Amino acid sequence: MRKSPRRRWFLLPALALLGAGVAWALVSRPRTPGILRVGAREVEFPATVSRKAFERELLGLGMPGYHLIVWKSGKAAPAALFRAEVTDLQVLDALESLGERPGNALGMATWDERKDPSSKAPDQVIAGPPVEILVKVPGRPEPLTLGEILEDPGGRGFDMRFGGHRANIPKWKSGCVVCLYSCPGSKVGNARYTVRDWVKGTTRFRVKAGAPLPEDGGRVAIIFRLK
Protein backbone atom coordinates (compact mmCIF):
# COMPACT_ATOMS: atom_id res chain seq x y z
CA MET A 1 0.00 0.00 0.00
CA ARG A 2 1.40 3.42 -0.95
CA LYS A 3 1.75 6.10 1.71
CA SER A 4 -0.31 9.20 1.19
CA PRO A 5 1.48 12.53 0.52
CA ARG A 6 0.01 13.89 3.76
CA ARG A 7 1.54 11.04 5.80
CA ARG A 8 4.93 11.58 4.18
CA TRP A 9 4.66 15.30 5.01
CA PHE A 10 4.20 14.47 8.70
CA LEU A 11 7.07 11.94 8.73
CA LEU A 12 9.72 14.23 7.25
CA PRO A 13 9.79 16.77 10.12
CA ALA A 14 9.77 13.94 12.66
CA LEU A 15 12.76 12.27 11.01
CA ALA A 16 14.58 15.60 10.84
CA LEU A 17 14.04 16.19 14.56
CA LEU A 18 15.23 12.67 15.37
CA GLY A 19 18.37 13.16 13.32
CA ALA A 20 19.10 16.49 14.99
CA GLY A 21 18.68 14.93 18.41
CA VAL A 22 21.11 12.13 17.62
CA ALA A 23 23.66 14.60 16.25
CA TRP A 24 23.37 16.82 19.33
CA ALA A 25 23.86 13.84 21.62
CA LEU A 26 27.01 12.80 19.77
CA VAL A 27 28.49 16.29 19.90
CA SER A 28 27.64 17.01 23.54
CA ARG A 29 28.59 13.61 24.93
CA PRO A 30 31.90 13.64 26.87
CA ARG A 31 34.57 12.09 24.69
CA THR A 32 36.53 10.77 27.66
CA PRO A 33 34.74 8.65 30.31
CA GLY A 34 34.67 10.27 33.73
CA ILE A 35 35.43 13.78 32.47
CA LEU A 36 32.71 16.23 33.42
CA ARG A 37 32.96 18.25 30.25
CA VAL A 38 35.06 18.48 27.11
CA GLY A 39 34.35 21.73 25.26
CA ALA A 40 35.84 23.42 22.23
CA ARG A 41 38.95 24.58 24.11
CA GLU A 42 38.32 23.34 27.66
CA VAL A 43 38.42 20.23 29.79
CA GLU A 44 36.64 20.17 33.15
CA PHE A 45 36.71 17.46 35.81
CA PRO A 46 35.90 17.04 39.54
CA ALA A 47 38.40 16.96 42.39
CA THR A 48 38.56 17.18 46.18
CA VAL A 49 40.65 19.57 48.27
CA SER A 50 43.53 18.33 50.46
CA ARG A 51 45.38 21.39 51.71
CA LYS A 52 47.01 19.74 54.72
CA ALA A 53 48.54 17.03 52.55
CA PHE A 54 49.83 19.60 50.05
CA GLU A 55 51.69 21.56 52.74
CA ARG A 56 52.78 18.65 54.93
CA GLU A 57 56.45 18.23 55.82
CA LEU A 58 57.51 14.63 56.46
CA LEU A 59 60.86 14.83 58.25
CA GLY A 60 62.44 16.30 55.14
CA LEU A 61 61.21 13.46 52.94
CA GLY A 62 57.91 14.94 51.77
CA MET A 63 57.23 17.13 48.75
CA PRO A 64 55.25 20.08 50.12
CA GLY A 65 54.08 22.55 47.53
CA TYR A 66 55.00 20.39 44.53
CA HIS A 67 51.95 18.43 43.37
CA LEU A 68 48.95 20.56 42.44
CA ILE A 69 46.59 17.95 40.95
CA VAL A 70 46.95 14.17 41.13
CA TRP A 71 44.59 11.31 40.32
CA LYS A 72 43.13 10.19 43.65
CA SER A 73 44.56 6.66 43.27
CA GLY A 74 47.99 7.74 42.01
CA LYS A 75 51.10 7.26 44.13
CA ALA A 76 51.55 11.02 44.54
CA ALA A 77 47.96 11.66 45.66
CA PRO A 78 48.87 11.87 49.38
CA ALA A 79 50.87 15.05 48.63
CA ALA A 80 48.47 16.82 46.24
CA LEU A 81 46.38 19.92 46.83
CA PHE A 82 43.61 18.58 44.58
CA ARG A 83 42.83 14.88 44.19
CA ALA A 84 41.20 14.32 40.82
CA GLU A 85 38.30 11.95 40.29
CA VAL A 86 39.74 11.09 36.87
CA THR A 87 43.07 9.56 35.92
CA ASP A 88 46.02 11.46 34.54
CA LEU A 89 45.69 9.36 31.38
CA GLN A 90 42.06 10.44 30.94
CA VAL A 91 43.06 14.08 31.23
CA LEU A 92 45.89 13.59 28.75
CA ASP A 93 43.55 11.89 26.27
CA ALA A 94 40.98 14.67 26.67
CA LEU A 95 43.52 17.44 26.02
CA GLU A 96 44.88 15.66 22.98
CA SER A 97 41.34 15.21 21.66
CA LEU A 98 41.13 19.02 21.40
CA GLY A 99 43.81 18.92 18.72
CA GLU A 100 46.79 20.19 20.72
CA ARG A 101 50.09 18.33 20.69
CA PRO A 102 52.04 18.10 23.95
CA GLY A 103 55.67 19.15 24.19
CA ASN A 104 56.99 15.82 25.54
CA ALA A 105 60.31 17.54 26.29
CA LEU A 106 61.24 15.98 29.63
CA GLY A 107 62.73 12.54 30.17
CA MET A 108 63.14 10.74 33.46
CA ALA A 109 66.69 12.08 33.84
CA THR A 110 65.15 15.47 34.61
CA TRP A 111 64.11 14.03 37.96
CA ASP A 112 66.52 11.13 38.44
CA GLU A 113 69.61 13.36 38.11
CA ARG A 114 68.25 16.25 40.17
CA LYS A 115 71.06 16.04 42.72
CA ASP A 116 73.83 15.80 40.13
CA PRO A 117 75.30 19.31 39.69
CA SER A 118 76.99 18.29 36.43
CA SER A 119 73.75 17.16 34.77
CA LYS A 120 71.80 19.59 32.61
CA ALA A 121 68.62 17.49 32.64
CA PRO A 122 67.19 18.95 35.89
CA ASP A 123 67.53 22.44 34.38
CA GLN A 124 65.26 21.64 31.45
CA VAL A 125 62.00 23.54 31.13
CA ILE A 126 58.67 21.95 30.29
CA ALA A 127 57.46 22.66 26.76
CA GLY A 128 54.07 22.60 25.07
CA PRO A 129 50.98 24.71 24.40
CA PRO A 130 49.99 27.14 27.20
CA VAL A 131 47.16 26.05 29.50
CA GLU A 132 45.19 28.21 31.91
CA ILE A 133 44.16 26.35 35.07
CA LEU A 134 41.05 27.51 36.91
CA VAL A 135 39.26 26.16 39.98
CA LYS A 136 35.48 26.39 40.33
CA VAL A 137 34.42 26.64 43.97
CA PRO A 138 30.78 26.06 44.97
CA GLY A 139 28.99 29.32 45.72
CA ARG A 140 31.42 31.54 43.81
CA PRO A 141 30.32 33.06 40.48
CA GLU A 142 33.82 33.09 38.95
CA PRO A 143 36.53 30.41 39.04
CA LEU A 144 39.77 31.04 40.91
CA THR A 145 43.12 31.45 39.17
CA LEU A 146 46.28 29.85 40.51
CA GLY A 147 47.49 33.29 41.54
CA GLU A 148 44.43 33.68 43.75
CA ILE A 149 45.04 30.34 45.43
CA LEU A 150 48.80 29.95 45.81
CA GLU A 151 51.56 31.96 47.43
CA ASP A 152 54.84 31.91 45.47
CA PRO A 153 57.79 33.22 47.54
CA GLY A 154 60.07 32.95 44.49
CA GLY A 155 57.95 35.49 42.64
CA ARG A 156 58.14 33.96 39.15
CA GLY A 157 54.51 32.92 39.05
CA PHE A 158 52.93 30.50 36.63
CA ASP A 159 53.41 29.58 32.98
CA MET A 160 51.55 26.30 32.71
CA ARG A 161 52.36 24.14 29.69
CA PHE A 162 50.86 20.98 28.21
CA GLY A 163 53.89 18.72 28.51
CA GLY A 164 52.13 15.38 28.05
CA HIS A 165 54.92 12.89 28.91
CA ARG A 166 52.77 9.86 28.13
CA ALA A 167 55.83 7.60 27.91
CA ASN A 168 56.70 8.34 31.54
CA ILE A 169 53.34 7.24 33.00
CA PRO A 170 54.15 3.51 33.44
CA LYS A 171 57.57 4.31 34.92
CA TRP A 172 56.24 6.19 37.94
CA LYS A 173 52.50 5.52 38.10
CA SER A 174 52.33 8.69 40.18
CA GLY A 175 48.98 9.82 38.77
CA CYS A 176 50.35 13.36 38.42
CA VAL A 177 48.15 15.68 36.39
CA VAL A 178 49.70 19.06 37.29
CA CYS A 179 53.02 19.76 38.99
CA LEU A 180 54.11 23.27 39.94
CA TYR A 181 57.57 22.66 38.48
CA SER A 182 58.89 21.41 35.11
CA CYS A 183 58.42 17.77 36.06
CA PRO A 184 58.61 14.75 33.71
CA GLY A 185 55.72 13.16 35.58
CA SER A 186 53.30 16.01 34.94
CA LYS A 187 50.82 16.26 32.10
CA VAL A 188 50.77 20.01 32.67
CA GLY A 189 53.67 21.73 34.43
CA ASN A 190 55.05 25.14 35.31
CA ALA A 191 57.71 26.51 32.94
CA ARG A 192 58.73 29.17 35.49
CA TYR A 193 60.44 26.65 37.76
CA THR A 194 62.64 23.62 37.07
CA VAL A 195 63.34 20.48 39.07
CA ARG A 196 66.68 22.08 39.95
CA ASP A 197 64.73 24.95 41.48
CA TRP A 198 62.88 22.43 43.61
CA VAL A 199 66.14 20.94 44.87
CA LYS A 200 67.55 24.39 45.66
CA GLY A 201 64.37 25.53 47.38
CA THR A 202 64.02 28.52 45.05
CA THR A 203 60.36 28.64 46.00
CA ARG A 204 57.88 26.64 48.07
CA PHE A 205 54.28 27.06 47.06
CA ARG A 206 51.68 27.35 49.81
CA VAL A 207 47.97 28.05 49.87
CA LYS A 208 47.38 31.74 50.50
CA ALA A 209 45.94 32.75 53.83
CA GLY A 210 42.27 33.41 53.23
CA ALA A 211 42.15 31.63 49.87
CA PRO A 212 38.45 30.79 49.38
CA LEU A 213 38.84 27.04 49.01
CA PRO A 214 36.50 24.52 50.65
CA GLU A 215 37.70 22.63 53.71
CA ASP A 216 39.69 19.46 53.11
CA GLY A 217 37.45 16.87 51.50
CA GLY A 218 35.31 19.53 49.82
CA ARG A 219 34.64 19.25 46.12
CA VAL A 220 35.71 21.62 43.36
CA ALA A 221 35.83 21.50 39.57
CA ILE A 222 39.11 21.92 37.71
CA ILE A 223 39.14 23.67 34.33
CA PHE A 224 41.96 23.37 31.80
CA ARG A 225 41.58 26.10 29.20
CA LEU A 226 43.83 25.98 26.16
CA LYS A 227 44.99 29.44 25.16
Q: How would you describe each model-predicted region?
A:
Residues S28-K227:
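Long, low-hydrophobicity ectodomains and other hydrophilic envelope-associated domains
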Residues L17-L26:
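Hydrophobic alpha-helical membrane-insertion segments, chiefly the h-region
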Residues K3-A16:
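N-terminal Sec-pathway targeting helices
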Residues M1-R6, V27-R29:
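Intrinsically disordered, low-complexity sequence elements enriched in Ser/Thr/Gly/Pro
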